[in-house]
Amino acid sequence: MSDLPIINFINFNQNGTCISIGTSQGFKIFNCEPFGRFYQDDEGGCGIVEMLFSTSLLAVVGMGENPAMSPRRLRMLNTKRHSVICEVTFPTTILSIKMNKTRLAVLLQEQIYIYDISNMRLLHTIETSMNAQGLMSMSPNSENNYLVYPSPPKVINSEIKDHATTNNINIKKSDAAEDPLRKDHFAYDPSDHSHPQSTTESTSNNHNRTYSSGNNNNTNSNPNKIIKNGDVIVFNLQTLQPTMVIEAHKGEIAALKLSADGTLLATASEKGTIIRVFNVENGSKVYQFRRGTYSTKISSLSFSKDNQFLAVCSSSKTVHIFKLGEKIIDNTKPNELNSDDDMDDDLLPQFENGDDEEEVDEETLDEEATSLNSSHSNKEPIVDSSRSTVGRMIRKSSQRLSRKAAKTLGAYFPIKVSSILEPSRHFASLKISTTTNQPIKAIAAIDDPISLNTNEYPDLFDTSNQADHQNTDGLKMIPVRVLSSEGYMYKYILDPERGGDCILLEQYSLLSE
């Protein structure tokens, strides 16, 4: 096991049909169905290996073991011809690369370079704030050609001290307090960057343009200022202009993802308890989901191709799958919805005990959550017997009582308050099969529905409980593939009607020869 290479990068291609993996020895490309490796290069450590759908074009960035594999150098490769198409060197380390059929975006710590992928001509440069996590998502659809990335921190003036509560706030007597309408009390402060301004400059070289996102380096100079860094910028890759800023969360963005058609944006904050989905066209919040009670690190978000499901991978080795059937939030008033949508993160209890986090994430759907997410189905959710524990049964009973109480109280409160009490839970979940106790990173891809012959898996399916199905040989299931940072690909199946626990069908190693 000690001879196995170290994994530096792992990802699906844009439609989830292939896998690219970068290691300390080189990189590999795999086909998902049927599973198998079809390309390998062992010329040096790779930190980024991005595919363009199922084509022979690869974007590769090295780990710096030699000058040719510098982490500042982007190499565009043709795997069929085994040749280098072009190389581009950047001033700092490349953190992320995203591609579709018309655009290529290269993310550095404080810049994003946008290229025409057909000729690698530089079209635009975006100056943004520090993005050490390399967060960026590009729509695979060239018609809704969008790029999203975290907005620079927004500074909000506040005279409320940290940890202040309604029990110990004292109103300070001052001239401004006695006369709150004094002109200088609301006067414009040029040093206030609560509304970042964008500037566009034109240069004569290849018509390149630079957009500044309003980076503010003095956000911590005033201790009475509140820093809000949960906004997301939506950038149109066709017009090369930002279209809007979506106020996604109060805390720092931990993960974001555009849907395959570029119409939806999913976001998660560093707390990892609330997942939100926005309409990219108007910025309205159309879905809000509760992943769990305890804080955890969200490693990735993934939409299904038809936007019916959203997979959320966390460091607790659990993947939650939410159903996006009917909109749970009325988006007829987008401004009102987004004005205080951070309330949920503040009012929900937050914990940081990583040991308990894993137990909470293992919860199954209770009756109320099942009726919400699968209102058109009277069948019980699937329960994986291998995940049945006494603790899980106790948590399920406790959650049922809590949900009933929230439902009763919600009837007496406005919609916004009741949505905080009873946010939508996951439709299905799976637990990554691993023996390590260390947190892992994972990414999921939800495939198109397939017809599964349950007779081929007698140990996984109890056909005696499937009297509703006249033909058990053609059970409709949805494959869910999960990549782990340990170097495994797992293939689970999801029942699109019943939800519940996803069943593990296959498991492959991406490192073994």
Curated annotation (Swiss-Prot):
Reported phenotype of the disruption mutant: Still forms preautophagosomal structures (PAS) in proximity to the vacuolar membrane.
Sequence motif: L/FRRG motif, positions: 289-293
Membrane protein topology class: Peripheral membrane protein
Region of interest: Disordered: 167-225, 333-398
Keyword set includes Protein transport: yes
Location in or out of the cell: Preautophagosomal structure membrane; Vacuole membrane; Endosome membrane
GO process annotations (BP): autophagy; protein transport
GO-annotated cellular components: endosome membrane; phagophore assembly site membrane; vacuolar membrane
Protein keywords: Autophagy, Endosome, Membrane, Protein transport, Repeat, Transport, Vacuole, WD repeat
Biased composition (Low complexity): 205-225
Ranges for region Necessary for proper localization to vacuole membrane: 289-292
Top-rank lineage group of the source organism: Eukaryota
Extent of Basic and acidic residues compositional bias: 172-195
Predominant place of localization: membrane
Biased composition (Acidic residues): 338-369
Family: Belongs to the WD repeat PROPPIN family.
PANTHER family per UniProt: WD-REPEAT PROTEIN INTERACTING WITH PHOSPHOINOSIDES WIPI -RELATED (PTHR11227)
Assembly and binders: Component of the PI(3,5)P2 regulatory complex. Interacts with ATG2 and ATG9. The ATG2-ATG18 complex is essential for autophagosome formation.
Record text about domains: The 377 first amino acids might form a beta-propeller domain involved in specific binding to phosphatidylinositol 3,5-bisphosphate (PIP2), leading to the association of the protein to the membrane. Association to the membrane can also occur through binding to phosphatidylinositol 3-monophosphate (PI3P). The L/FRRG motif is essential for the cytoplasm to vacuole transport (Cvt) pathway, for the recruitment of ATG8 and ATG16 to the PAS in nutrient-rich medium, and for its recruitment to and dissociation from the PAS under starvation conditions.
Name of this protein: Autophagy-related protein 18
Organism: Kluyveromyces marxianus (strain DMKU3-1042 / BCC 29191 / NBRC 104275) (Yeast)
Classification of source organism: Eukaryota, Fungi, Dikarya, Ascomycota, Saccharomycotina
